[in-house]
Amino acid sequence: IFEGWCVGARNQKESDLKKGLNKIEKEHDSKLQWRKTVNRYLKNQYKNLFNKIDKLVYLKAPNFNRIFKWRLLQEEKLKLTSKNKKTMSKYKVREFIMFYERITKHMMKDFSKISDLTIFLDNSHRSKKMKFFNK
């Protein structure tokens, strides 16, 4: 099992990279260097890695804001269980997920068409339906 936030992510069309989606992209990547580099890696190196996956299961969140809330909840739980570990503030969590926003939203659009199984999650992180895709 190979698990991760953006496992299986595909590259975007160059034209889709032009408009900054969030504060990080608008203020720190105005020349598109980071976006183009990530996109190139998704198109080449990561594609080669992801092509080795036998079956792809996609856990689809209801929306990107829900992902922020879940990540914040994860941080709050970490705070309770790890007394000596440093955790992120709400601001830092929001900033952290901005780095993954573009890829995540791109995946949310049509990833269920390429995954072998998409599990649609409700706001409470429970499975509400599943969709199998026959390739």
What are these regions (language model features)?
Residues C6-K135:
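Conserved NTP phosphate-binding and transfer environment spanning the P-loop NTPase/kinase superfamily
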